[in-house]
């Protein structure tokens, strides 16, 4: 049963209110809380003994959405979930994932999700994933999420991936890999906020394997208090391709940030670029907002929201 806390989590991580007409699978506390398929999108339980689901999207499916959020509302729960996506040729679909934890006690709650995408030819896929954690007042249980995502993009297809870590995740280790065929494109936007003593490590690999393949990574992060972030994006060009990695971070308090982008060209026709910048909030930006009547804290919050938008 979905209670008030569950509903608030679903709204935060998937912008989900009520029951949509789209394909849907809500996983709650390691069980299936709700599921519905559509004429063109089928969601089924795995048959190989692993926890998770298979999502099959028929060729030619356009304008449809698929919601697959995960919520945890217990303390001490740990799970490993495997979701496989099979997306046919000539599709145009949105997939909305995400995980929210409401930890009610002092034990660690943890979700490890392994997603594998098989995208056919000439398709467009928009994938959105938000992570959020919170605790009952006075409780200290850790909230941990470790997503692994591997995407195989067929010829002429495009994937746009938007990942957001909103707040409240004590530890996360992310691994993301894209294998791009000729004429395909991937655009990744990663937004990350850490605070307190939180730690976040993100490894990303984009393999541009065919002529005309393109890959772009835009990473924006804010590290506050005593938190730690490490971002290691790698772009490998094996053909006449284009890759661009841009990492921008704001550091505050006693936080630490390590950004180590890498590019590898295995073809004379590969064009690869990487950029990385880490800095604090400029004093003149704060002053400008403070002269408009904002407090120092309000000015900081306004700048950070704009940076992570």
Model-derived features: where do they sit?
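C-terminal functional modules
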Residues: 1-26, 30
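Sequence-level preference for short, compositionally simple segments enriched
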Residues: 1, 288, 297-298
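Conserved beta-strand/loop scaffold segments within soluble protein domains that form the structured core
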Residues: 25-28, 33-294, 304-309
């Amino acid at each position: 049963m979905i209670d008030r806390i569950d509903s608030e989590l679903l709204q935060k991580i998937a912008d989900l209110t009520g029951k949509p007409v789209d394909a849907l699978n809500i996983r709650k506390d390691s069980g299936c809380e709700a599921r519905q398929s559509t004429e063109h999108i089928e969601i089924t339980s795995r048959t190989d003994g692993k926890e998770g689901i298979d999502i099959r999207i028929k060729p030619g499916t356009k304008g449809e959405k698929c919601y697959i959020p995960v919520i945890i509302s217990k303390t001490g729960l740990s799970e490993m979930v495997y979701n496989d996506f099979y997306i046919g040729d000539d599709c145009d679909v949105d997939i909305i994932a995400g995980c929210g934890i409401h930890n009610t006690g002092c034990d660690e709650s943890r979700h490890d999700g392994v997603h594998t995408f098989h995208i056919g030819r000439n398709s467009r896929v928009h994938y959105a994933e938000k992570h959020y954690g919170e605790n009952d007042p006075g409780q200290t249980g850790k909230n941990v999420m470790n997503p692994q995502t591997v995407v195989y993009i067929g010829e002429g297809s495009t994937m746009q991936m938007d990942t957001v870590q909103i707040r409240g995740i004590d530890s996360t280790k992310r691994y993301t890999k894209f294998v791009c065929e000729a004429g395909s494109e991937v655009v990744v936007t990663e937004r990350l906020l850490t605070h307190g003593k939180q730690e976040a490590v993100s490894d990303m690999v984009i393999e541009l394997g065919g002529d005309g393949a393109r890959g772009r990574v835009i990473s924006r992060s804010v590290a506050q208090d005593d938190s730690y972030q490490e971002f290691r994006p790698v772009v490998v060009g094996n053909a006449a391709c284009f890759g661009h990695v841009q990492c921008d971070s704001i550091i505050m308090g006693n936080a630490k940030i390590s950004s180590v982008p890498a590019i590898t060209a295995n073809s004379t026709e590969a064009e690869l670029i990487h950029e990385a910048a880490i800095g604090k909030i400029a004093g003149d930006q704060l002053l400008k907002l403070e002269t408009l009547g904002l407090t120092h804290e309000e000015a900081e919050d306004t700048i950070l929201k704009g940076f992570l938008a």
